[in-house]
Swiss-Prot record:
Gene3D superfamilies: Leucine-rich Repeat Variant. Residues 657-685 have a biased composition (Basic and acidic residues). Keywords: Nucleus, Repeat, Ribosome biogenesis, rRNA processing. This is Nucleolar protein 9. It comes from Candida albicans (strain WO-1). It comes from the Eukaryota. The gene is NOP9.
Length: 715
């Protein structure tokens, strides 16, 4: 007797087909595809935490090879024209039609889908968007699909703005194009409506998305789009969109953003209502305890920071802020005090507090309340917490009232040398922010800040009477030249730490000219080979360039010191001029040699001496032009006129200027000599004209008559 079939499968399949999570593509998988673990193909599996996990099927080997090759072709981008590339993209999209969901959940094919979305036109974008409908939640929680979804959301925001700003003529032209295209009837729905339908899919899952590794990034992007904020790049190091690992991965797979990233988009009025609903939905699922837990959660904290930043657009009560902190009218609370103390001492918590202080979401009175109740009486103690509390103090310097800022400066400046650690590389940022705060307060206590920094970085340097035996401790302690990439022959890229230190020294030189003088002495104390290496270094060359500045009304001792510094460059000019970094330094020497025409002539002569090498170099030709070397070679008088013009600009002697500077004694003496010479020339000219006149009179016979009259008059 034959084996009887088990009954009820058709009915079971029909019931599954009516379920909302059913995916028809999955049910029609090829028979040669094997599925591990025998999971239900189209079931939406919700775990206890409410995270959906829909299985969309596997990509078979033949499809995988094709899509892998297509991804490689797009990555190389060896197309001769944009039309050729667009044709290739169209063919790949045709091949991928109906398979989008299983492609985005595959590690290799998800990269292909991301590239296709970046290059797709508006109709293709809408088509892909529609394929994801009813599955956006599952994609947001997926490791690979979430990245594809983020790219799709950014491009969708750009398309929404374009549809909003379209003129009637553009709309008519678009309608004609759609009529000419196949399947145009499927793309007549506005992108705004498609986007709102997707937003509705996410609403039941918002609280689950907040602390999920992948969905939280999608949620943050949705909030940014709804609020009309700038959508950050997904590859830059300071991007708020992706995690550090994700940004590194994108650089490795060479997926670059298009012009839709790093900008804000115009949004319709309906988006503000959707943002309000999102905020209300999230806050309904939170209480004070859970909100505070999220604020110190590694994944949930950035989402909460963003919600606090944008809630003011739709909620005047600032519900998220008051869910975490007490109202501004309330006094000190022991539970809140413990929570704030934890924020001030823990890395994630301190980053959360710093972020909500720095962004424009919280009202100033909220921040001022927290500061006065829990931080004001221990500013110095918090500044000593080099990995947590110090960042809160730095943020407060630019958010509090001027009186409170000066109070913080008064507390920290006397102890600044103790707070900075050279060995452990701590609190350079604090010194940076103190300088910025001092500048914003009209250089408040500048001399004390500079003295503290010299105590830390150059304890043996005499600020008032610098001597010739000054060591290199100042630039060594700040730049950490020993152990840096300076002088490496392996083409090592300068590190981020070197860039940070170089910028700090540049800021010091802008802040006070004493730091410039100290840097000059340190340059002269360096071996010439080491100094030249700095000029060729990608980061330290900027330090050399920024040090080549001349102070107005420069005293004579400083001018002599400037001449001594210029002597270091002797014999190195041509090499620097032909280098991408050094050429900028040679350009700066034109202004640095003001009032020193002999040194200008020496540098120009050095360039002329090896003119063939200079002119062969791209950078050398720029230096040749900026130094006016053609005039130096052919019209030396005009070149000297350029120097004279520069000196007049330095002294402020222009035709329109009404103020006259006090002239130096040597200038007054030169003017007297010139005036005396002019008088002597006039007297000589008059004598010569009188002699010529007498000779003429003698020749005509009128001289004796005049002579008699003169004698008669004298009698």
């Amino acid at each position: 007797m034959g084996k009887t079939k088990s009954r009820g499968r058709r009915a079971e399949k029909k019931n599954k087909k009516n379920e909302p999570g059913f995916n028809e593509d999955v049910s029609n998988l090829d028979s040669d595809v094997t599925i591990t673990n025998q999971e239900p193909l189209s079931s939406s599996i919700s775990s206890t935490s409410g995270i959906p996990n829909t299985f969309f099927g596997l990509v078979d080997n033949n499809e995988l090879d094709y899509f892998k090759q297509a991804e490689s072709t797009l990555n190389i981008n060896a197309f001769e024209t944009d039309e050729e590339r667009q044709g290739f993209i169209n063919s790949v999209l045709d091949e991928a039609q109906g398979k989008e969901l299983k492609l985005v959940t595959n590690q290799i094919c998800s990269k292909l889908m991301e590239r296709l979305i970046l290059f797709a036109n508006h109709n293709q974008l809408k088509k892909i968007f529609k394929q994801f409908q009813n599955h956006f939640v599952s994609l947001a929680f997926h490791k690979y699909a979430s990245h594809v979804l983020e790219t799709l959301l950014v491009r969708s925001a750009a398309l929404i703005e374009k549809e909003l700003t379209q003129t009637d003529e553009e709309k008519l032209e678009k309608a004609e194009e759609e009529e000419a295209e196949e399947n145009s009837l499927n793309n007549d729905v506005p992108m705004e409506d498609l986007f709102i339908s997707m937003l509705n899919e996410f609403k039941p899952h918002l609280t689950t998305m907040i602390d999920h590794s992948y969905a939280s990034h999608v949620l943050r992007l949705l909030i940014l789009i709804l609020a009309g904020k700038e959508l950050p790049s997904s590859v830059t190091s300071n991007s708020t969109l992706r995690s550090k690992k994700s940004k590194i991965a994108r650089k490795m797979i060479e997926i670059k953003d298009n012009e839709d990233f790093d900008r804000a988009f115009q949004t319709p009025q309906s988006f503000k209502n959707e943002l309000r609903e999102y905020c209300q939905t999230i806050i309904a699922g939170l209480d004070t305890k859970s909100a505070r837990e999220l604020s110190i959660h590694k994944i949930g904290s950035p989402v909460l920071q963003l919600l606090i930043q944008v809630e003011g657009l739709v909620d005047r009560e600032r519900s998220f802020w008051h869910l975490i902190f007490a109202k501004d009218s309330e006094g000190k609370d022991s539970v809140e005090e413990s929570f704030v103390e934890y924020l001030l001492s823990e890395s994630v918590g301190s980053h959360f507090l710093e972020s909500i202080i720095k962004n424009d979401g919280a009202r100033p009175k909220y921040i001022e309340r927290l500061y006065k109740l829990y931080m004001k009486d221990r500013v110095l103690k918090l500044a000593k917490r080099s990995t947590t509390g110090v960042y809160i103090i730095q943020a407060l310097l630019f958010k509090l009232k001027p009186v409170e800022v000066e109070y913080i400066l008064d507390q920290i400046i006397p102890e600044l040398a103790e707070l900075i650690s050279i060995a452990e590389n701590q609190n350079l940022d604090l010194a940076n922010k103190l300088i910025d705060a001092s500048i914003s307060r009209g250089n408040y206590r500048r001399d004390e800040i500079i003295n503290q920094l010299f105590i830390k970085f150059a304890p043996n340097y005499d600020i008032e009477n610098p001597s010739d035996n000054t060591s290199t401790e100042f630039i060594e302690n700040i730049l950490q030249l020993t152990g840096s990439t300076l002088g490496n022959t392996r083409d090592d890229w300068p590190t981020a730490e070197e860039r940070k230190r170089a910028l700090f020294l540049e800021k010091l030189m802008e802040y006070d000219y004493k730091c410039v003088i100290c840097t000059w002495f340190n340059f002269m104390a360096l071996p010439i080979e080491r100094f030249v290496q700095m000029c060729f270094h990608g980061v330290f060359c900027h330090v050399v360039e920024k040090a080549l500045i001349v102070e107005p009304e420069e005293p004579k001792p400083i001018q002599i010191l400037r001449k001594r510094l210029l002597n270091i460059f002797q014999g190195q000019i041509v090499g620097l001029a032909c280098n991408s970094y050094g050429s900028h330094i040679v350009d700066s020497l034109w202004n640095f040699t003001v009032l020193l025409p002999m040194y200008k002539d020496r540098i120009a002569s050095e360039l002329l001496g090896d003119s063939h090498r200079v002119k062969e170099s791209t950078y050398g030709r720029l230096v040749w032009k900026n130094w006016g070397m053609e005039l130096f070679v052919r019209k030396k008088y005009d070149w000297k006129a350029l120097i004279k013009q520069q000196e007049q600009e330095y002294y402020g002697e222009t035709e329109d200027s009404t103020e006259k500077r006090t002239k130096k004694p040597i200038e007054l003496k030169m003017e007297r000599l010139a005036e005396e010479k002019r008088r002597q020339e006039e007297m000589a000219e008059r004598a010569q004209s009188g002699y010529t006149k007498r000779k003429l009179e003698e020749a005509t016979g009128t001289a004796s008559e005049k002579k008699q009259k003169l004698r008669g008059r004298r009698r």
